[in-house]
Amino acid sequence: MSQHLVPEAKNGLSKFKNEVANEMGVPFSDYNGDLSSRQCGSVGGEMVKRMVEKYEQSMK
């Protein structure tokens, strides 16, 4: 299991992951063994994209 830089952020990141997956139509659950690498990667990529956009907006 991976370790988070900020352990307190784990719940927030899980919630964010589920929100993004739902918006993209990817059926995330506690067990994601049925999902393709492409589906998982697209959710993770979208999460990173949104986090970077949010950070860039805060820099303005």
From Swiss-Prot:
GO terms for biological process: DNA topological change; sporulation resulting in formation of a cellular spore. GO terms for molecular function: double-stranded DNA binding. Disulfide bonds: none annotated. The record marks E19, V20 as: Cleavage. SASP are degraded in the first minutes of spore germination and provide amino acids for both new protein synthesis and metabolism. It comes from the Bacteria. Keywords: DNA-binding, Sporulation. SASP are bound to spore DNA. They are double-stranded DNA-binding proteins that cause DNA to change to an a-like conformation. They protect the DNA backbone from chemical and enzymatic cleavage and are thus involved in dormant spore's high resistance to UV light. Belongs to the alpha/beta-type SASP family. This is Small, acid-soluble spore protein C2. It comes from Clostridium perfringens (strain 13 / Type A).
